[in-house]
Design a protein with these regions (language model features):
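Inter-lobe coupling/hinge segments of SF2-like helicase ATPases
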Residues: 1-246
C-alpha cells in the first residue's frame, strides 16, 4: 500500500499517526483531514503538511475539545471556522451529575436499573493497577469488587491499555455485542468507541481527569435515542478540580 500511495494509485488514505512516518510519500496530496486534532502535536501536523508538493494542501482539523493553542488560532490566526452546535436527529443531551461518597450506593443502584432496562454502562478509573503512591481505586481491583459485591449476576468486563491489541479488540467487540453489561476501563476508551446501547458513563475519581478527558469520556454515551447519564464520582479536591467538574 505504501508504494501504491506513492504512485498515486490510491485516492483516499485513512490512517493513524503512521501516515506521518518518513517512508510514507504522496504523489499529489491535496487535502488533509485531521480528526481529534488535540491528539496530534504541532510538529506532527507540520510534518504531514510537508509531505505535499506545491501548492500546499488544504487542511481541515476537527475536535470537540480544542486545546488552548487551537483556540488562540481561531481568534488570531487566519482560519475559517465551522461549528456543529446541535445533536444528530433523535438524540438527547447527556445528563451529568456529581456523585458524593454518601451517594455511591445510590448511583450503583441507578446503574443496575439502567441495565435492567436492557442498557449497558462504562465505569472508568484513572489507574490500571493499585499504586502505593496514590490513594486511588484501580480498574483491575475494582472490576473484581464490582463483579463480586456490587453488580452480582451481571456480566462485567475489564479493558485497559496494557492489554494486547487483539485482546482489547475482542473485549470491545464483545461489549458492542452485549456480552458484557458493564465495561470497567481506563482512559483507553476516551476516543473511537461507539456503543449506542451504552447509556451510563460512571467516572471514578473524576477530579483526577482533565476537562478534555471528561468531555471525551462523556461523548462515549448519548449515541442513540435513549436518555444517557454521566456520573462523576469525585472527592472535593482543589478549587481547580471542582471548577473543572462543574464545567
Amino acid at each position: 500500500n505504501i508504494e501504491r500511495i506513492k504512485q498515486g494509485e490510491i485516492d483516499l488514505v485513512i490512517g493513524t499517526h503512521a501516515l506521518i512516518q518518513q517512508d510514507v510519500e504522496f504523489k499529489k496530496l491535496g487535502l488533509i483531514v485531521i480528526d481529534e486534532q488535540h491528539k496530534f502535536g504541532v510538529m506532527q501536523r507540520t510534518r504531514l503538511r510537508q509531505k505535499a508538493h506545491k501548492p500546499q494542501p488544504d487542511v481541515l482539523v476537527m475536535t470537540a475539545t480544542p486545546i488552548p493553542r487551537s483556540l488562540s488560532l481561531t481568534v488570531f490566526g487566519d482560519l475559517d471556522i465551522s461549528t456543529i452546535d446541535e445533536l444528530p436527529p433523535g438524540r438527547t443531551p447527556v445528563e451529568t451529575c456529581r456523585v458524593t461518597a454518601k451517594k455511591e450506593n445510590d448511583a450503583y443502584g441507578f446503574i443496575r436499573k439502567e441495565i435492567e432496562k436492557g442498557r449497558q454502562a462504562f465505569v472508568v478509573f484513572p489507574l490500571v493497577d493499585e499504586s502505593a503512591k496514590l490513594d486511588l481505586k484501580s480498574a483491575t481491583v475494582e472490576a473484581e469488587r464490582l463483579k463480586d459485591e456490587v453488580f452480582t449476576g451481571l456480566n462485567v468486563g475489564l479493558l485497559h491499555g496494557q492489554m494486547k491489541s487483539d485482546l482489547k479488540d475482542l473485549i470491545m467487540t464483545d461489549f458492542i455485542k452485549h456480552k458484557y453489561d458493564i465495561l470497567v476501563s481506563t482512559i483507553v476508551i476516551e476516543v473511537g468507541i461507539d456503543v449506542p446501547n451504552a447509556t451510563v458513563m460512571a467516572i471514578e475519581h473524576a477530579e483526577r481527569f482533565g476537562l478534555a478527558q471528561l468531555h471525551q469520556l462523556r461523548g462515549r454515551i448519548g449515541r442513540s435515542s435513549h436518555q444517557s447519564y454521566c456520573l462523576l464520582f469525585a472527592t472535593p479536591g482543589s478549587l481547580e478540580s471542582r471548577q473543572r467538574i462543574a464545567t
